[in-house]
């Protein structure tokens, strides 16, 4: 009988064993949290670049039906004009392409998260930027994405000389 009661007591975990398991899970979670946070940030940066690429494609669709001409607007107005000029392609449910997914705040109806060209599309050089994130879109310590006339999008760090150069070639 004594052996049977000893077996019954040994079936569960002790409090110390449970606490050790909880501590180990806590340590693993604290190690994974920064990795997950960074992965989510990178996903938003990629979504932001995708939005810029979609805006370029929208402009190309507009130009196809207007003898190769893009809207004559400059700066942020270029992106807003595409929204007005090609309404079936960018209705309210697709208006999300007008802002960067990294932004923590909502934009107004006449705002975008991107800068536009200081001149009309036809006057932009082949290697000049067509658009870019507004400063701070990716946080104060990061640069942003730049959209080029050929439709490619590149990411630049804040201290990269090209980021500073492109920022001055685009209007807010």
Residue ranges and their predicted role:
Residues 1-13, 172:
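N-terminal leader/signal peptides at the extreme start of proteins
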Residues 2, 124-172:
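C-terminal accessory segments of extracellular proteins
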Residues 9-40:
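N-terminal single-pass transmembrane signal-anchor helix
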Residues 30, 34-97, 152-153, 162-171:
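Conserved hydrophobic/amphipathic alpha-helical signal-anchor segments
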Residues 61, 103-106, 135, 152:
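Short, flexible active-site-adjacent loop segments at beta-strand->alpha-helix junctions, enriched
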Residues 72-74, 97-102, 130-133, 147-148:
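Short beta-strand segments
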Residues 74-80, 105-108, 137:
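Acidic-and-aromatic substrate-binding clefts and catalytic sites of carbohydrate-active enzymes
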Residues 84-127:
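Acidic, glycine-rich loop-and-strand cores that form catalytic or ligand-binding grooves
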């Amino acid at each position: 009988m004594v052996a049977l009661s000893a077996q019954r007591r040994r079936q569960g975990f002790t409090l110390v064993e449970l606490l050790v398991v909880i501590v180990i899970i806590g340590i693993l979670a604290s190690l994974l949290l920064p990795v997950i946070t960074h992965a989510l940030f990178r996903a938003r940066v990629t979504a932001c670049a995708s939005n810029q690429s979609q805006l370029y494609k929208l402009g190309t669709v507009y130009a196809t039906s207007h003898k190769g001409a893009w809207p004559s607007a400059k700066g942020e107005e270029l992106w807003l004009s595409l929204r007005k000029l090609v309404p079936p392609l960018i209705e309210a449910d697709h208006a999300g392409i007008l802002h960067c997914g990294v932004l923590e705040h909502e934009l107004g109806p006449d705002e975008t998260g991107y800068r536009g060209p200081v001149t009309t599309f036809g006057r932009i050089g082949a290697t000049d930027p067509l658009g870019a994130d507004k400063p701070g879109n990716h946080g104060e310590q990061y640069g942003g994405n730049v959209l080029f006339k050929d439709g490619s999008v590149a990411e630049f760090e804040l201290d990269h000389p090209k980021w500073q150069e492109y920022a001055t070639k685009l209007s807010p």
